Structure formats: C-alpha cells, structure tokens
Amino acid sequence: MSSNASHRELAEAWLSEDPDPVTADELRRLLAACDAGDPAALADLTERFTGSLEFGTAGLRGILGAGPQRMNRVLVRKVTAGLAAYLVASADDARPRGVVIGHDARRNSRVFAEDTARVLGGAGLKVFLAHRPWPTPTTAWAVTDLGACAGVMVTASHNPPAYNGYKVYWGNGAQIIPPHDTGIAAAIAKIGRSDQLAMPALDELRRAGSVVDLTEELHERYLAKVVELRASPGIDGRSLVIAYTPLHGVGALSVERGLLLAGFPQVHT
C-alpha cells in the first residue's frame, strides 16, 4: 500500500467519527483536492495523519483543524478518555473528587470544554464546569479549593488565534509533571474510536449531579484570595485611574472586579 493510500484510509476512518461538521467538511475538501492530484493537498494530508499531537507536561497545543495533528473534537474526546482512565487508576477517590474544567474564549473552547465534561461524566467522574470563559489561574485555584483530583483548562495561552490547547492540572493545582504526563499519554494511546465513548448529554449529567456548573460565587472567592495577597494594602487607590486591555484574552472581568475589591474603582478596559 502506498503512503498516500494509507493516509487516505486514516483520513476516511477519522471522517467517519468526526462529530464536527466544520472539520468534517474541511477534510472532505482536502481529500477531493488530493484526488485531483494537488501536491500541496497531498503534503497537507500526509502531515495531518502522520502521528498525533503529543501529550506532555504542557498538555496539548496545536492548530485547529481535522486530523490527529490538529486540535479538534475527536482528539479532545480521546485525550479526555485517556485522562479519565489514568485518574481512576491513580486514585480510588478520583470519581467523587472530580475534575474542574475551565476554558478561554478561543474558537471551539466552549465546545471542547463541554465534550471534556461529557466524557469525564460518562466515565463516572464528577465534573465542575466553568459557566463562562475565565483566566487559567482561576481553574488551577478551583482544583485546590474544591478538592478535585485534577483540572482541565482549554486554552492555547499566548499562541495565535488559529491555535487551541488542553492543559491538565493535578490535585495540588499545579501543571502536571512526570510521571503523570507519560502515564496519561500511555492511557490515551489505548483509546479506540471516539464515537464509541460513553458521552451522556450535559443536561442528563446535571440532573444526576455529575456535572456542577461553577458560577460567579467561586470566582468571587478566588478574587478575594487574590486581593489578600496584595503587597501594599494600605494604599488609597480611589484616585488612581487605571487603563487595562486584555489583549484578546479573558482577563477583563477578573481584573476589573479584582481591582475594585482591592480599592481601585477607576478601571477602564
């Protein structure tokens, strides 16, 4: 079998389990271009279906698109299934302690977060799901505050808009370190088709108490802890005018509210 033929078979198998009409259509168009003999399309197909994005201490990060070398719903579901298997194998109380899931405002971040919640819930793990986009440190802090066994943050941090990512935090609120990264990667490698995973609807999981939506109450507690850490609490900030830009990030609400709680009411974003 030629390399092109094997990559095409991998692509067709991927297409058969892709739940996202956008990436499915993208892959169909790529295959059509390959059939027409487009050398750039053939090279693109080969790159997308040679190996996969590697899971490490920083989790996953890649360009959005179809195929295992891109960030997409198929990959997120498989990675989450591997994470769930590793957590359950690592701790007897992983299921009741649960996993915190946060996300930023990038393209597909909410969808990836909800898919993550459904896969974890289907594996019997309790899920604490952010109700809106929020900064990464909020997720890490929530892991320790809620006593969860892990946290997932859907974000690509400073990368350009075409990217998205998937960060994992351990029960201590810190980004995972060895041997957890390789253990999770090994568990991911054992996962089969993503469309065969147990993925109850979110509403069903909410009714069962398996998914709990995290509201502004948790965010307020987080900001209160942040304000406690200010270096000079005696400063009168009422007359100080502050301009802030989130630079396309999700920090605006946190910064505005945090500064207000710290005594700096004149914040412009």
Language model segments and positions:
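Phosphate/oxyanion-binding active-site loops and adjacent basic polyanion-contact surfaces
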Residues: 71-81, 131, 135, 215-225
